[in-house]
Regions:
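Regular secondary-structure segments
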Residues: 11-18, 155-159
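Metal-dependent nuclease catalytic regions and adjoining charged, substrate-binding loops involved
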Residues: 55-62, 68, 97-100, 110-177
Length: 177
């Protein structure tokens, strides 16, 4: 779709700016204040960082993104690691943050803690680049297991629906029921 293409172009422009200083194209120059401030943060910058996480029922471990034992896959738009602290950013190209959901940040923070064992605190944000809104959240290593559990309840409901072949409508902004 056109919106998807636009989102991909924005992500690529931000990635190339952070990675190698490629100037932001004119049509996306509204990104400059955001990417300049992110680029000024101290630390090792990782763009489009792919996480593969396995889970054996007791412990979450790092694995390859397409490994057979992968339990969770996620891609962080930008992770900046500076010793025990990190910054995690997910760019959003929607009009505004009205339907912002930070559950994605919880899972990516959990994966960041797994990938970078030295990190103990993460400041994360959904960066709505068009409206210049930031939905922020702090994460601590002590709560890592609760971040991984973010989708336990909906996944259990999905498994039950599949087992009993009962698919009840769920009210929400994207549901016409």
């Amino acid at each position: 779709s056109e919106a998807m293409l636009y989102g991909n172009q924005v992500h690529k422009a931000a990635e190339h700016f952070i990675k190698d200083g490629t100037p932001i194209p004119k049509k996306f120059e509204y990104l400059n204040p955001i990417v300049n401030s992110l680029n000024a943060i101290e630390g090792d910058k990782h763009c489009e960082l792919r996480f593969g996480i396995s889970y054996d029922g007791e412990k979450h471990k790092e694995t390859k993104f397409f490994a057979k034992d992968v339990w969770f896959r996620g891609i962080a738009d930008l992770v900046i690691v500076d010793g025990e602290k990190a910054f995690l950013v997910d760019y959003k190209t929607g009009k505004n943050a009205k339907y912002a959901d930070t559950a994605q940040l919880d899972l990516l923070a959990a994966a960041t803690f797994t990938h970078f064992p030295e990190v103990n605190h993460i400041k994360s944000a959904l960066a709505y680049v068009v409206s210049n809104e930031f939905i922020k959240k702090d994460h601590t290593r002590e709560l890592q297991s609760s971040y991984y559990a973010t989708f336990d309840e909906p996944l259990e409901a999905l498994a039950a629906a599949e087992e009993h072949d009962v698919w009840n409508a769920i009210s929400g902004p994207l549901c016409g029921w």
